[in-house]
Amino acid sequence: MKVLRFNQDASCCVVNSGANELTVYNCDPFGKCFEFNISNVNGDSNDNGIGYDSLEAGSSSIESQVIAEMLFSTSLLAVVDKGQGINTGKKLKIVNIKKRSLICEIAFPSLIVDVVMNRKRICVLLDNDQIFIYDISCMKLMETLDLWESNNEGNLNDHIKVGERASNMINENLKNGNELDRIRSKSNNNNDQTNSDNGRSRTYSINGSHKIKPQLTLSGNDNSILCYSKYSSSKQNPARILNDIVVYDALNLKPINYLNSVHKGCVLKTSVSIDGKLLATASEKGTIIRIHKTGVDSDFASGPLLYKEFRRGSRPSHIHQLLFNKDSTLLVCVGDSDTIHIFRTDDDGLALDGIDGDIGSDSGGSLELIKNRIPHEQVKKFFSRKIKSHIPNQNLHRDFAHINMDRIVHTVVGFPEEFDNKIYVASDDGSFKTYTIPSKHGQCVLNKTSHFI
């Protein structure tokens, strides 16, 4: 079993429960909402939607064979089944999970790596380093982006056509956003259950080889701020480094900002805040977590784009999830270590203390010249800063709160929108846990443990 991911407001959790079966669980109260077979969502499924014809149940593979992205509390689910072969891995299905019916299916020229969506846009990342952006109301292709192209101009002539039926059915489902809310009130039983997980994986396979997966993250609000990692070298350069970030307005289809070399190595994981103003990044090493201003607000030009910097730990870790809460005051970091870290982003004392531009620009001047221009104490401060700027920072701020986990348990987390001080933890040992985040520095308190069936 694999826990795939929470929906955008953490009201539901989608689980790949084995052999092409997807199950949607309500988080509060905890319980099963829907289950259906991925390969039979076109209406030809049996009564309970369960079938076993491709994946091995209980697969121990770290990377799930299924991508599933749920649209808030609606009945819309975007699904990619890579377990049926190469051709199915190139197809995106938009399904109605309540009716177990296929709304539309889109075939792409290459394997699908990731899918993200909100109420306005759905974005699809392919393994040929292209991003397809769709209007979710009618599934019209709005733009294509190339991770190698400097101008990021899409080719609308290569769009994939979807019929009127898709547009009408999607609009109908978007209007029925309270379907799961009604079911949620009935799901306060069935708490006896088992699970597993997947975060979005570190690498993906192409013809047996592995490469770092480009990152794709979309803001939860209707502004649809899309942030994606981009190669900092030319396509001919074998040393492919994914450490540049493009901030893109997916609603108005125009680039907003370009963040250059956010880490020394490849960017392994990203997350954008709900309002699209902040972007969190982690590299392959996973010891440093950085928060950047995306530049979507008018105040970004008044200061550096690097907003906050945290030390997760001294040992390297594969980070597979970063997530902001709804107010962007907390950032959770999940890796393959035995601790889940929660950082505070709203403490002014944590802001980076940059070097003054006018003093720093005098680095080529003589000591005597500097003494004549600024007082003695400022001279000392100047040299302290210059020396410090060339020494790795060993005193970065650490987590505000944490959760101790079994190291072997792969985990996905969610911040429930309706509970400010809670966090959900779904793990591949079959547990679903609810924790309270402390008001002061310390360990999160376990409130409740449930189990996936």
UniProtKB/Swiss-Prot annotation:
Membrane topology, record value: Peripheral membrane protein
Domain of life, per lineage: Eukaryota
UniProt entry keywords in alphabetical sequence: Autophagy, Cytoplasm, Membrane, Protein transport, Repeat, Transport, Vacuole, WD repeat
Record InterPro entries: PROPPIN, WD40/YVTN_repeat-like_dom_sf, WD40_repeat_dom_sf
Compositionally biased region (Low complexity): 187-198
Record carries keyword Ion transport: no
Stretches for region Disordered: 177-207
Positions of short motif L/FRRG motif: 310-314
Locations listed in the record: Cytoplasm; Membrane; Vacuole membrane
GO terms, molecular function: phosphatidylinositol-3,5-bisphosphate binding; phosphatidylinositol-3-phosphate binding; phosphatidylinositol-4-phosphate binding
Gene Ontology cellular component annotations, sorted alphabetically: cytosol; endosome; fungal-type vacuole membrane; phagophore assembly site
Example GO BP: vesicle organization
WD repeat start-end pairs: 4-137, 252-347, 419-453
Entry note about domains: Contains a beta-propeller domain involved in specific binding to phosphatidylinositol 3,5-bisphosphate (PIP2).
Job description of the protein: Required for cytoplasm to vacuole transport (Cvt) vesicles formation and mitophagy. Involved in binding of phosphatidylethanolamine to ATG8 and in recruitment of ATG8 and ATG5 to the pre-autophagosomal structure. Protects ATG8 from ARG4-mediated cleavage.
Protein family (similarity comment): Belongs to the WD repeat PROPPIN family.
UniProt protein name: Autophagy-related protein 21
